[in-house]
UniProtKB/Swiss-Prot annotation:
Top-level taxonomy: Eukaryota, Viridiplantae, Streptophyta, Embryophyta, Tracheophyta
Region feature (Disordered): 1-161
Region (2 X approximate tandem repeats): 101-144
Protein name: Dehydrin DHN3
InterPro entries: Dehydrin, Dehydrin_CS
GO cellular component: cytosol
Alphabetic keyword roster: Repeat, Stress response
Residue ranges with Gly residues bias: 20-38, 131-142
Recorded family membership: Belongs to the plant dehydrin family.
Annotated organism of origin: Hordeum vulgare (Barley)
Repeat region (Sequence), residues: 101-123, 124-144
UniProt entry tagged with the keyword Repeat: yes
Composition bias type Basic and acidic residues, residue spans: 1-12, 143-161
Compositional bias per record (Low complexity), positions renumbered to this chain: 93-107, 115-130
GO biological process: cold acclimation; response to abscisic acid; response to water deprivation
């Protein structure tokens, strides 16, 4: 029965690997404006493909979901750690950015269903990054100006202006 059917293959991190087409079929992420047009939270089924972390940079392990804890095991990274790795400007413990502003666990773009509005879910250049949901109007600082979540995180980082 050995005809290329790899049943229990894993990569170097212990994640299961399918024997065919790993990482394919994910090129159309960032479905802009697709979401809960009638309000409510739209939570699509999670595709746990983890093929090098959706951005698929060759040779980059910065987008894996676990890291070595120094004791031979692995620990899951929090959403804040993943976001910090993607931001430019170093990986020091500068400030706690707050991550996704209380929307933990939501994947994909929720959107508002407006015409032509691109549902600024904060995924600027990070296609399909989990946890970056919303319309960009969460806590607009009282000015009425809509900001993306990435803009808010960048504001909190020193030296980004």
């Amino acid at each position: 029965m050995e005809h290329g059917h790899a049943t229990n293959r894993v990569d170097e991190y212990g994640n299961p690997v399918a024997g065919h087409g790993v990482g394919t079929g994910m090129g159309a992420h960032g479905g802009v404006g697709t979401g809960a047009a009638a309000g409510g939270h739209f939570q699509p089924t999670r595709e746990e493909h983890k093929a090098g972390g959706i951005l698929q940079r060759s040779g980059s392990s910065s987008s894996s979901s676990s890291e070595d804890d120094g004791m031979g095991g692995r620990r899951k990274k929090g959403l804040k750690d993943k976001i910090k790795e993607k931001l430019p400007g170093g990986h020091g413990d500068q400030q706690q950015t707050g991550g996704t502003y209380g929307q933990h666990g939501h994947t994909g773009m929720t959107g508002t269903g407006e015409h032509g509005a691109t549902a600024t879910g904060g995924t600027y250049g990070q296609q399909g990054h989990t946890g970056m949901t919303g319309t960009g109007a969460h806590g607009t600082d009282g000015t009425g100006e809509k900001k993306g979540i990435m803009d808010k995180i960048k504001e909190k980082l020193p030296g980004q202006h």
